[in-house]
Swiss-Prot record:
The keyword Nucleus applies. Its main location: nucleus. It comes from Saccharomyces cerevisiae (strain ATCC 204508 / S288c). It comes from the Eukaryota. This is Pre-rRNA-processing protein IPI1. Keywords: Nucleus, Ribosome biogenesis, rRNA processing. One of its GO terms (biological process) is rRNA processing.
């Protein structure tokens, strides 16, 4: 009996039932009833955005794989700077956006430059607080394997010097000079010239002009005080540089004893001479103008004067920038 009943049930699955007039079609046994009405649907771990203007959730988009998303995110933050300049969002914003100095897209890098200009025009002190991170990634860009990233590195340096030049030259005077020499292809003291970029006439003159202008600004901030930059009076500068200032005055900048490195740990450089890095210069504190000028005269000035003479003879925009740099060097060191 049981076997015959199962056979009948199996046969019913393959039989087409006759529809009767006036009666609806029967529903399947596994049909789901969707006729219920609910006022709310609760989904775990999913919440509606209560504040559509909250920019903290956009920070992760700065690491998005799409170039347009990164660019649009930088533009959004740039437009929002006036309203968030005094908020706690600035620190994570700069921490997430500064690595874009080495971004593969030129549009993203230009968007970051515009963002830095917008922040600096509202409050330059914020850029000064993140000066170390800026210098770190600028140095990385100067030695980057991609030529375009390397060429744009001095753009970031020029814009950073415009808002916090004194902070930059005090902390990384020698490193930045070595980096600018590298992108110009001039070779540095203690290094092989073939290791740097070879300077040829085929190189884009536009980028050479940008590099020379960045070097001009770096030397201007590193070897001149604020009064000399504004007035252009060299006599007062040389007179004041030799006088002993009151050591008990409140310093003009934060962390005046940072160069002593009392609470920092540094990695030991093994065989620094063989690697081509002058460890003495890199560890030298360049807090004052006199020290920076002495380092520049001893290590960099002869090379700069030799190279700019060649560029001046070639003429063009590069020649103008080189002549401008030559005038500055004569004003400071002659």
């Amino acid at each position: 009996m049981t076997k015959s009943r199962k056979q009948k049930q199996k046969k019913q699955d393959f039989l087409r039932k006759k529809l009767k007039v006036g009666k609806p079609k029967e529903k399947a046994r596994n049909a789901t009833d969707t006729s219920f009405v609910s006022k709310t649907i609760s989904i775990r771990n999913q919440h509606l955005d209560q504040n559509p203007h909250d920019l903290t959730k956009r920070l992760t988009l700065l690491k998005h794989h799409n170039i347009n998303v990164r660019k649009e995110t930088l533009t959004t933050f740039q437009k929002s700077i006036p309203s968030i300049i005094k908020s706690r969002l600035m620190t994570p914003l700069l921490t997430q956006s500064i690595p874009l100095i080495c971004d593969e897209s030129q549009q993203v890098r230009q968007g970051l430059i515009d963002l830095v200009d917008e922040i600096g025009s509202h409050d330059a002190e914020i850029l000064k607080l993140h000066c170390n991170i800026f210098v770190l990634y600028i140095n990385m860009a100067m030695t980057h394997i991609v030529t375009q990233i390397q060429a744009d590195s001095t753009k970031f340096l020029s814009h950073l010097l415009k808002y916090c030049g004194d902070e930059v030259v005090r902390k990384s005077w020698v490193k930045l000079l070595n980096g600018v020499f590298g992108v110009l292809g001039w070779g540095q003291v203690g290094k092989n010239d073939s290791a740097s970029i070879v300077q040829t006439k085929k190189r884009n003159a536009k980028y050479v002009t940008i590099h020379l202008n960045a070097l001009y600004t770096l030397v201007e901030y590193g070897c001149q005080d604020e009064r000399a930059r504004s007035d252009g009076d060299t006599a007062e500068t040389t007179e004041d540089s030799g006088t002993l200032r009151n050591p008990y005055l409140i310093p003009d900048y934060p962390q005046p004893f940072e160069h002593l490195k009392l609470f920092t740990r540094e990695l030991k450089v093994q065989d620094a001479t063989s690697s081509g890095v002058n460890a003495t210069l890199l560890s030298l504190a360049t807090q004052d103008i006199d020290t920076r000028k002495a380092v520049f005269i001893e290590q960099f000035l002869p090379i700069v004067r030799k190279k700019i003479e060649v560029i001046i003879k070639e003429g063009g925009e590069c020649g103008k920038s080189a002549n401008k740099l030559k005038t500055l060097l004569a004003k400071i060191f002659d």
